[in-house]
Amino acid sequence: MAEDSAGLPSNYQFWMQKLSVWTQASTLETQRDICLHLPQFQEFLRRMYETLKEMDSNAIIERFPTICQLLAKSCWSPFILAYDESPKILIWCLCCLIKKDPQNSRESKLNSWTRRLLSHIVSTSRFDIKEVGLFNQVLGYAPTDYYPGLLKNMVLSLVSELRENHLNGFSSQRRCPERVRSLSRDRVPLLTLPDFEPLVEALLTYHGHEPQEVLCPEFFDAVNEASLLKKISLPTSAILCLWLRHLPSLENTMLHLLEKLISSERNSLRRIKCFMKDSLRPEAAACHPAIFRVVDEIFRSALLETDGAPEVLAGLQVFTRCFVEALEKENKQLKFALKTYFPYASPALVMVLLQHPKDIPQGLWHQSLKHISEMLKEIVEDHGSYGGPFESWFLFVHFGGWADITAEQLLMSEAEAEPPEALLWLLAFSCSPGAGHQQRARTMVEVKTVLGCLTKLFRSPALSARDLQAAAGENLGGDPRPPACQQLVRRLLLHFLLWAPGGHTIAREVITLMAQTDAIMNEIIGFLDYTLYRWDHLCVEAHRSRKLARELLTELREQALPGQVNQ
């Protein structure tokens, strides 16, 4: 096409052919060819605009029917839209096609087609907000036509820059720390918008070369709150970065969890497990020992401050179970040695406790319990190098199922058999780690006496509540038992009611006699809830015992006063 007849550059046909090739093939050679010719093509567009702006839209279409094809192919090329001022020049060219007062359907259709292309360019290109506003004012279409695409493109552009990617063959410059900090602060009001999630993730995983944190604290706080309230969904890798870079976020998450443990989710381990997996991310703790140790230390402090509150203890055990599952799933080959998770504990004891009871033949449980007891006793009573009694107890109760298995094993042993000292010591230690040697010995005597009576009654066909009252009666001259010992005896009685054939018929009567206070009522409900949870994980096949435990749990929850126990 001649330049004098068309009013367009003489190489118009050359670029039409190039665009056809570029749009039909997406090979590496094609992309290189595009990048090679982008400067010349932009100059062609500029000269073409200088020609088109002097013409009426009808005249342009009448004389040059392929102009729409050329502009459309240019507008849908991400390489052209990403290069320098090409998007602006394309907009100028398209504006030449718009008829301000269309007189017929053909002109109206051309206007609609042109506006769609303009909206596409505005929403996919990087423009200053003032330029976007100017386009809107001149072209006369609503922001809703292009804002969603513009927002998405802006987010993708920022993500690309943060990750120092190469866009269409052009390297984006690294952002300075002040710019990254400003970016994190300015996006706080917007971070719950779904389109902003990739940017939030990119900011959290951004790693510059600065010695100090570049993201603002307000950003971390807002992300953590939004994550807790389910207003934003982030992958575990981003949550891991959040907690490693901002300790208060992890602490706030833990405080939120503990509040639920003690209030709304009390005695509901299944809901606690779901909540814990959603918010605390045990897999994040498995991925990095630092996170596990912070969570562990918060649980430790909570147990000390609440004097070993059962709900906190149960939460620790659920967290540990989830953590171990994540550890086994994510780290078939451990990235970190176990000692980095439990730096002050005996490695041998940790290895034994990490074994899930269901992975050990039931006939060997007694042997495993004896081994655990001997190792703990050596550390506690021989003053080993792994901390005091509380530290050993704290490690043991992470894997609290072993203590309940100990009680069950002792109850179901032969009536004539002498209860093993190792298992008695383990029970006494589990209920009162701070007790001295003499106090622990007394507890062992108390438990041994109660067990002797219960094992004799275990297979009795006819039982009464009075029989169990007598079996659990105070001993040693009538001195009152310490509270921890009383709680241990109650747990033995509850185990008996669930496992003894004759216990099922008197269970409700015995529990009514036991639950003299709201605290004991909550204790019994917590025991039943945890027992069912533990049996599920052990795959215990005890239909009658399970049925009784579920019925008792439902009935006691209904009896509990509103606000005392989660419904």
From Swiss-Prot:
Its main location: nucleus. Coiled coil: none annotated. It holds the Pfam family Fanconi_C. It is found in: Nucleus; Cytoplasm. GO terms for biological process: cellular response to oxidative stress; interstrand cross-link repair; nucleotide-excision repair. Keywords: Cytoplasm, DNA damage, DNA repair, Nucleus. One of its GO terms (cellular component) is cytoplasm. Belongs to the multisubunit FA complex composed of FANCA, FANCB, FANCC, FANCE, FANCF, FANCG, FANCL/PHF9 and FANCM. This complex may also include HSP70. Interacts with ZBTB32. Upon IFNG induction, interacts with STAT1. Interacts with CDK1. Interacts with EIF2AK2. DNA repair protein that may operate in a postreplication repair or a cell cycle checkpoint function. May be implicated in interstrand DNA cross-link repair and in the maintenance of normal chromosome stability. Upon IFNG induction, may facilitate STAT1 activation by recruiting STAT1 to IFNGR1. This is Fanconi anemia group C protein homolog. It comes from Bos taurus. The gene is FANCC.
